[in-house]
A protein has these predicted regions:
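N-terminal export leaders
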Residues: 1-2
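Extracytoplasmic/secreted envelope proteins and their assembly/folding machinery
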Residues: 82, 86, 90, 96, ...
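Extracytoplasmic
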Residues: 39-44, 57, 72, 110-117, ...
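C-terminal motif of bacterial Sec signal peptides marking the signal peptidase cleavage site
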Residues: 7-10
Length: 193
């Protein structure tokens, strides 16, 4: 009888599900070239980029045919997208040569300009075959009294998906962020002239 009970230990009524490894995608976007920053000049403070409604999690997001949003558990960004976009924005503008320094909140430098943002759209639309990004920005000149708003704009970009798999979606999302940052740099350059 004990032999029979020992044999049942290997039996299970639970289905055997394979382990699925989570993949984390970096959202590291760099300006293609680095311009020389002036040694004496303006300082830009980039405040935190807020996550728009529903964009606070790390899962890769795509639209389903019925219009609902799928947030994947196994395919995710290495950090929350708004945090990555904030860091990407700071590095992009530092490499632009527009400012002598681009700093984060907490810096001891006195900034003439402040940039605030909100990530409004960050999704792959598999039905349309594109990745969509929208970033709202406000550029403030802190020098005059009262403070002056130089720019308030929402930059958007769509980049074609190579296919509908997660690596292609992640690559298209990075390319869309790069396009939004390229356009934002041009807007900021025009606003501070």
């Amino acid at each position: 009888m004990l032999a029979g009970l020992a044999g049942l230990g290997g039996c299970s009524v639970l289905p055997q599900t394979p382990y699925v490894q989570r993949r984390e995608w970096p959202l590291d976007v760099r300006r293609p070239t680095t311009a020389v920053a002036p040694k004496q000049g303006r300082v830009l403070l980039v405040r935190s980029v807020r996550a728009g409604p529903g964009l606070g999690d790390r899962g890769l997001r795509w639209l389903l045919p019925d219009g609902s949003v799928h947030v994947d558990f196994y395919e995710q960004w290495a950090v929350p997208p708004a945090e990555a976009v904030e860091d990407d924005t700071r590095r992009w503008l530092a490499d632009s040569g527009l400012f002598s320094a681009v700093v984060a909140t907490g810096s001891r430098l006195t900034a003439e300009y402040v940039l605030e943002g909100e990530l409004l759209t960050f999704v792959a639309d598999r039905n349309a075959g594109v990745a969509r990004v929208a970033l709202a920005l406000v550029l403030i000149d802190q020098r005059p009294n009262p403070i002056k708003v130089l720019l308030q704009k929402t930059e958007t970009a769509e980049v074609k998906l190579a296919n509908n798999d997660p690596p292609a979606m992640a690559e298209a999302m990075r390319a869309a962020i790069a396009e939004v940052l390229r356009r934002s740099e041009a807007d900021i350059a025009a606003a501070i002239r």
